[in-house]
Structure formats: structure tokens, C-alpha cells
Amino acid sequence: MTMLIREGTLEEALQVVTRVKEFANGETLDSMSQRLGDKNSLILVAEKNGAIVGFKIGYELDEDTFYSWFGGVAPQARNEGVAQMLLEAQEEWVAEQGYKTLKVKSRNQFPAMLRLLLRNGYLI
């Protein structure tokens, strides 16, 4: 039951998007591609036993700011620390790239995400 966090593709992220009911009527491969455009971006995936169970996507807003845009964890992999591992991997990559700020938005309808952000010292 080893969890592997690695750079992935939008197609891999979409495997999780389609399994998360909170994202119903949400993003498609085309909409995600358009959002990223030619911006400097990072697509992380969490892989467990060969299956993609989580993702985190972000992109550059400006030379100092990276925006953590979209992420999720498949229902069967929740409460296993997947979101925390993805967040830590993204933070490490953002720091290595020299960004000064990591910006994120969330909504009250995603209380688990709000708790994760608060636990990690984010201002919301």
C-alpha cells in the first residue's frame, strides 16, 4: 500500500475528477487545458497500487505567485493523508521554483479542504 506522489498528466487527474461527486458537472480535459494554457504549471498525482487516487494542479499567476488551483482525492482514498502528501509536494516544488507566494482558494462547501489549509498555516 505504498503511495507515490509524482508529476502526472491532465488525463490522469481527470480519472479522479470523474469519481468525485463534488465535481459533478465540473472540469473536462478541454476546460483544464484551457485554464493552464501555456502558463508554467504543475500537475501532481497520487498513485496507490497502480491507481490514480488524487491530484493537485496549480499554475503561475506571476513571477512571484503560484496558484494552487484544483485538487481532489477519490472517495475510497480519503482519510489516508493523500491531500496532505500532495500539498507538501506542491509546496516543495513551488519553493524550488523560486515563487514567493502560494495562493489558494476554497469554499465553505469543502470543509475538509479548509481544515487541511488551516492545519498547514494557510490564511483563509
Feature map (PLM): residue ranges:
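Conserved active-site alpha-helix within GNAT-family acetyltransferase domains
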Residues: Q84, N108-I124
